[in-house]
UniProtKB/Swiss-Prot annotation:
Family: Belongs to the PsbN family.
Matching InterPro entries: PSII_PsbN
Biological processes, Gene Ontology terms: photosynthesis
Transmembrane segments: 4-24
Gene (name only): psbN
Localization terms from the record: Cellular thylakoid membrane
GO CC terms, sorted: plasma membrane-derived thylakoid membrane
Name under which the protein is recorded: Protein PsbN
Annotated function: May play a role in photosystem I and II biogenesis.
Key words of the record: Membrane, Thylakoid, Transmembrane, Transmembrane helix
Length: 43
């Protein structure tokens, strides 16, 4: 394979992995540990 194709596939796979981890953190089980700054702040 061409080195450019390998690089594009590697960068694409890393981007998909980071996006998947972000979605998992935002909406999966770890989201229970996230705090809402608007609820924590009292006027």
């Amino acid at each position: 394979m061409e080195p450019a194709i390998v690089l594009i596939i590697s960068v694409g796979a890393a981007l998909v992995a980071v996006t998947g981890y972000g979605i998992y953190t935002a909406f999966g089980p770890p989201s229970r540990e996230l705090s809402d700054p608007f609820e924590d702040h009292e006027d």
